[in-house]
């Protein structure tokens, strides 16, 4: 029995060593494997995707997805454990934190764009969103076309800001687009009347902390398509492959359905056909 146990132990140790020796020397997987720790950048204010729970722990849809991915990476590297070290970031610092090496990946509500690919790489898509606008119910604003002469707040440097500017030009809506630093400033402008609307991803708008949510409503317009992904360091194909392998497993085995239901059943959101296709495309074969 002892001989069998020793043989099995030697086999698994050899398999783990083999998995780690195949990692390119310049990949962050080397550091991750050596430290048995992976650093994940996450925002505290992007509910329901990435935010702080009651005990100040990192929670959300994207956080749960990344926890499952980390479990897969642990298995791929043959590690007995792989701890997560959370790195707090803002909407402005999330990509530079990954690019500079302060974090190995970023999990939240980050939209993939060609411009952002100049700074970071991205995983397979993990969600699809759209840009929306929240306005006061007391206003006469019933659609985006009614925003002429109004002020629309959007976080500076986001795809929402770009989308609103493009839609204003496309539909000849002569509104003032006001840049804010974060969601808190956008909400403050909306509640004080300094802005007539606040633009962001629709589910982020649903998760806003408004003093009196009943006073506000979301316009029906869907003003852009926002494909979310995990941000990764540029050029690190081994880490990107490990992450995409984890995502493929989650999608193939159906674990993503449970994560989706956990976060979106409570607000009555059903999985759209487009999102089902997105998961299907990410369920790559080994």
Which stretches of residues belong to each language-model region?
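Extended ligand-binding regions for polar small-molecule ligands
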Residues: 20-23, 29, 60-72, 138-140, ...
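Ligand-binding clefts/hinges and TM-proximal coupling segments of bilobed small-molecule sensing domains
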Residues: 20-23, 159-178, 213, 217-218, ...
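Extracytoplasmic small-molecule ligand-binding "clamshell" domains
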Residues: 21-106
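Bilobed "Venus flytrap"/periplasmic-binding protein-like clamshell domains
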Residues: 39-48, 58-75, 111, 129-183, ...
């Amino acid at each position: 029995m002892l001989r069998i146990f020793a043989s099995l132990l030697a086999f698994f140790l050899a398999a783990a060593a083999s998995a780690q020796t195949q990692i390119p020397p310049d990949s962050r997987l080397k550091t991750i494997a050596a430290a048995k720790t992976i650093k994940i950048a996450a925002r505290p204010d992007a509910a329901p995707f990435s935010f702080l729970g009651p005990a100040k722990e990192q929670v959300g849809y994207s956080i749960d997805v990344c926890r499952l991915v980390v479990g897969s990476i642990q298995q791929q590297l043959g590690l007995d454990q792989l701890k997560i070290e959370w790195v707090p970031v803002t909407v402005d610092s999330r990509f530079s934190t990954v690019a500079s090496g302060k974090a190995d990946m970023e999990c939240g509500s980050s939209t993939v764009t060609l411009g952002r690919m100049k700074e970071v790489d991205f995983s397979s898509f993990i969600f699809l969103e759209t840009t929306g606008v929240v306005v006061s119910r007391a206003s006469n604003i019933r659609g985006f076309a009614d925003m002429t002469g109004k002020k629309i707040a959007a976080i500076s440097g986001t795809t929402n800001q770009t989308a609103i500017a493009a839609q204003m030009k496309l539909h000849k809506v002569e509104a003032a687009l006001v840049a804010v630093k974060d969601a808190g400033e956008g909400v403050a402008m909306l509640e004080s009347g300094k802005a007539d609307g606040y633009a962001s991803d629709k589910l982020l708008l649903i998760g806003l902390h408004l003093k009196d949510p009943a006073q506000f409503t979301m316009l029906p317009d869907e003003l852009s398509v926002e494909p979310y992904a995990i941000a990764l360091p540029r050029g690190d194909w081994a880490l990107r492959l490990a992450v995409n392998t984890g995502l493929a497993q989650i999608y193939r085995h159906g674990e993503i359905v449970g994560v989706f239901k956990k976060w979106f059943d409570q607000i009555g959101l059903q999985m759209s056909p487009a999102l089902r296709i997105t998961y299907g495309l990410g369920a790559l074969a080994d």
